[in-house]
Regions:
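Short acidic, glycine/serine/threonine-rich loops at helix termini
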Residues: 98-101, 123-128, 168-171, 191-197, ...
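PLP-dependent aminotransferase-like
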Residues: 107-154
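N-terminal entrance/gating region of PLP-dependent enzymes' catalytic architecture
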Residues: 1-82
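Conserved beta-loop-alpha segment that forms the PLP phosphate-binding cup at the N-terminus of a helix
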Residues: 67-75, 85-108, 121-125
Length: 254
């Protein structure tokens, strides 16, 4: 380490050519169809506010408006998916882990079933939670093959709405046929807000939990996602902790 720091201005000038010159430019024409979109300017301002105020959402006393704003966002979005609540997460990997955690705690699932095209975060979640993991072959369109499904009476079935490789949407007619059904809608979830394409996710409202990335088709900075539950009170009962300095329960992996 040097004996003396360079100071903020000199440090920014030193880093600018690297940070700005060597970043992937998502607003470039050659980034067309990239799942991580360019962000609108208003999110830059909000990110500055967030860094400046450094709010802690563990309790309303430490982040009065931020806690209220999160609830308003959840209350606005959940009806599109048939869910009754949830919370924000730092990315859909965390959202998926939270969903499978709730499935284990409140329904006692023993294994996770997903297609071979499911996001690797599902395998991560199963491993972290001590659940067995079964991958189902896909059909010619990259969707979970209906004909390969077996007994799911003790399973959490994970259906993908928008696979990473091809954007395929698993058959949502399978919703409700397992002990717990989670839909990883990180990519295609915002289709529910579309007047013309919401039908592509018909059936999703019967799921027990849904993950949606805000930093994809909702054009928010990374990492930002939502985990939503059909029965939030039930789900939260298995993934909430408190005590000590926390006056309110801490839900999930926040």
């Amino acid at each position: 380490f040097p004996d003396f720091g360079r100071g903020e201005d000199e440090t920014l000038n030193l880093l600018a050519p690297y940070v700005l010159g060597r970043a992937t430019r998502l607003d470039s024409p050659i980034s067309f169809a990239h799942m991580d979109p360019p962000t609108p300017w208003i999110t830059w301002a909000m990110s500055l506010w967030n860094a400046r105020l450094n709010q802690n959402l563990l309790h309303s006393a430490s982040a009065p408006f931020a806690v209220e704003a999160e609830k308003k966002v959840i209350d606005w979005l959940t009806p599109f998916y048939g869910m009754d609540g949830g919370h924000m997460c730092s990315g859909s990997t965390i959202a998926n882990i939270t969903a499978l955690w709730a499935a284990r705690e409140v329904r006692g699932v023993k294994k996770v079933v997903a297609s071979r095209s499911a996001h690797f975060s599902i395998a991560k979640a199963a491993s972290l939670l001590g659940l067995s993991y079964e991958q189902i072959p896909t059909d010619v369109r990259g969707r979970l093959n209906l004909n390969e499904i077996e007994d799911m009476s003790d399973a959490c079935l994970v259906l993908t709405a928008g696979t990473t490789d091809t954007g395929a949407i698993d058959p949502l007619v399978l919703v409700g046929q397992a002990k717990w059904t989670h839909v990883d809608a990180a990519w295609a979830g915002p289709l529910r807000l579309s007047l013309t394409h919401a039908y592509l996710l018909d059936g999703i409202t019967g799921a027990d939990s849904i993950a949606v990335s805000a930093h994809k088709w909702l054009f928010q900075p990374k990492d930002s996602s939502l985990i939503m539950f059909r029965d939030t009170e039930l789900a939260n009962s298995g993934i909430s902790f408190g005590g000590s300095y926390l006056a309110a329960p801490n839900v999930g992996l926040q």
